[in-house]
Amino acid sequence: MVNPTTSEVHPTMGVKIFSAGVAACLADIITFPLDTAKVRLQIQGEGQISSTIRYKGVLGTITTLAKTEGLPKLYSGLPAGIQRQISFASLRIGLYDTVQEYFSSGKETPPTLGNRISAGLMTGGVAVFIGQPTEVVKVRLQAQSHLHGIKPRYTGTYNAYRIIATTESFSTLWKGTTPNLLRNVIINCVELVTYDLMKGALVNNQILADDVPCHLLSAFVAGFCTTFLASPADVVKTRFINSLPGQYPSVPSCAMTMLTKEGPTAFFKGFVPSFLRLASWNVIMFVCFEQLKKELSKSRQTVDCTT
């Protein structure tokens, strides 16, 4: 992101995909409790979790979960989350530069905003379709409660895949693809384009060098913009994916039920943990991604020089 100078090593597509996958997995492991808190806040009010448990704020939700269901609950669904990043983030982030270059091929000028958005749309759309089953399982495991004699729907990650496919249908593993596609198209375009533009502005105007402080600031700004614009689609996606069979006939029905029963603010439930999670996830992921790309490219150049 931001074209390297002629003196810099151009990372290959394989290096970008691998770096994105590893960086995203690391970011997920560190920020996963925030994601679990976000999911619980987003589904609060629809009646599946006992009304005696109320989650208030980020720290309140994390503390309540730890006290009532145990610390491991904060990481329930992590294996599916890691699988999601391997199949999803590695593609949407790792392929972004390559697809952007394809749309800009034959032009001497830097990629236009249209090129960047087109690349974000394409990589985000493909990644969502491939990674959707992991998203469904992750959300289901994060949402299920063990309180007050409620029997868990799933005992683990692979049990969840099997139960969903056999008791609901194989296609249920792609449940919520539409709102998730909308959410991730927004995220991919806003996150990657904002990060790219912010980083380019800082580097090209010589405000910051293309190094860790620049990556930190760019990632933080991208995280805020992305969270604000993607929140409504994110809440609807979580509600629809976690819903029982027949609870919502369609995605629009889910959105309308939320609007009529809980009001427009329901679309921003879990905004604070969502922002904290996405901003911190972005910072960790982009910093690790940039450093991994550099180091792997240098290693590759060293190997090439010695052979």
From Swiss-Prot:
Binding sites annotated in the UniProt record for fatty acid 16:0: K56, K269
Which controlled-vocabulary keywords does the entry list?
Answer: Ion channel, Ion transport, Membrane, Mitochondrion, Mitochondrion inner membrane, Oxidation, Repeat, Transmembrane, Transmembrane helix, Transport
Q: Name one Pfam family in it.
A: Mito_carr
- InterPro entries, A to Z: Mit_carrier (IPR002067), Mito_Metabolite_Transporter (IPR050391), Mitochondrial_sb/sol_carrier (IPR018108), Mt_carrier_dom_sf (IPR023395)
Q: How is it modified after translation?
A: May undergo sulfenylation upon cold exposure. May increase the sensitivity of UCP1 thermogenic function to the activation by noradrenaline probably through structural effects.
Per the record, the domain of life is Eukaryota
Give tissue specificity per the record: Brown adipose tissue.
Chain positions of Solcar repeats: 11-102, 111-201, 210-295
On subunit structure and binding partners, the annotation says: Most probably functions as a monomer. Binds one purine nucleotide per monomer. However, has also been suggested to function as a homodimer or a homotetramer. Tightly associates with cardiolipin in the mitochondrion inner membrane; may stabilize and regulate its activity.
Q: Summarize the protein's role.
A: Mitochondrial protein responsible for thermogenic respiration, a specialized capacity of brown adipose tissue and beige fat that participates in non-shivering adaptive thermogenesis to temperature and diet variations and more generally to the regulation of energy balance. Functions as a long-chain fatty acid/LCFA and proton symporter, simultaneously transporting one LCFA and one proton through the inner mitochondrial membrane. However, LCFAs remaining associated with the transporter via their hydrophobic tails, it results in an apparent transport of protons activated by LCFAs.
What this protein is called in its record is: Mitochondrial brown fat uncoupling protein 1
List the taxonomic lineage. Answer: Eukaryota, Metazoa, Chordata, Craniata, Vertebrata
